[in-house]
């Protein structure tokens, strides 16, 4: 379940002081060091131009290309946005939800770097339409919802993009903050912020220089920066380098959005 890692009690992050490794063997762990789970708040916002701490999931920037970049062999077509793509990625990653290959997991790829079998997401779709021992559809409510939302109601018509788009719409509705004291203040309600909060805003947007990086509606430029703090761990996290392979991107990380940071 998504909520196993995106914990509601921790504002959809993991709430951990230190990152933890997933329970798979070393062979199937990615080269990227363990990281804390990113939260889901306001990820539908138009300012969100990348996903994950190193921006591995992003729109194609080249002018002669269209679509979205994925590090896995998963087609980006018909997914509505980055959040829709990211919603299904954990399902096809061995170190997250897919698991290691074995007798009980025939859907996992045979080796690291091998293409993800297309049957993985097809199997997820089919589970929504399976019948129980009495011949009754266990996912009847899902069938009704897919029929209502997309005009489809049988497994053969449901595509992985339908799953991703549905999850993204839920995240958009469930985890958004559009009516905060800050929003009301910007809209003209000068009483929405306390005197201390106003002084903090002046510092944040003024001499403190915070807004140089923490800018926009959700307080992030979504750029990649190094704050100069050394990584003391044995397995150092090279950040943006894992997405681009460029030496100059070593130790750069995406600016985390500060909207709702106190949750």
Regions found by a protein language model. Name each.
Residues 1-263:
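Periplasmic c-type cytochrome electron-transfer domains
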């Amino acid at each position: 379940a998504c909520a196993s890692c995106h914990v509601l009690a921790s504002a959809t992050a993991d709430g951990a002081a230190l990152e933890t490794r997933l329970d798979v063997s070393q062979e199937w762990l990615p080269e990227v060091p363990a990281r804390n789970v990113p939260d889901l708040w306001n990820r539908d916002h138009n300012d969100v131009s990348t996903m994950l701490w190193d921006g591995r999931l992003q729109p194609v920037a080249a002018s002669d290309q269209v679509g979205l970049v994925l590090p896995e062999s998963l087609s980006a077509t018909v997914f509505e946005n980055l959040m829709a793509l990211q919603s299904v990625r954990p399902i096809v990653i061995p170190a997250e939800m897919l698991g290691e290959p074995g007798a009980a997991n025939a859907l996992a790829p045979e080796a690291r770097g091998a293409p993800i079998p297309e049957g993985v997401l097809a199997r997820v779709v089919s589970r929504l339409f399976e019948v129980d021992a009495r011949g009754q559809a266990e996912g009847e409510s899902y069938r009704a919802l897919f029929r209502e939302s997309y005009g489809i109601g049988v497994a053969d018509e449901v595509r992985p993009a339908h799953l991703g788009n549905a999850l993204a719409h839920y995240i958009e509705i469930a985890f958004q903050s559009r009516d905060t004291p800050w929003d009301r203040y910007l809209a003209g309600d000068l009483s929405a912020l306390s005197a201390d909060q106003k002084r903090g805003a002046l510092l944040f947007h003024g001499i403190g220089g915070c807004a140089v990086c923490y800018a926009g509606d959700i307080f992030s430029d979504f750029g990649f920066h190094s704050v100069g703090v050394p990584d003391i761990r044995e397995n150092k996290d090279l950040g943006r380098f894992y997405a681009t392979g460029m030496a100059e991107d070593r130790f750069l990380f995406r600016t985390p959005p500060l909207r709702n940071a106190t949750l």
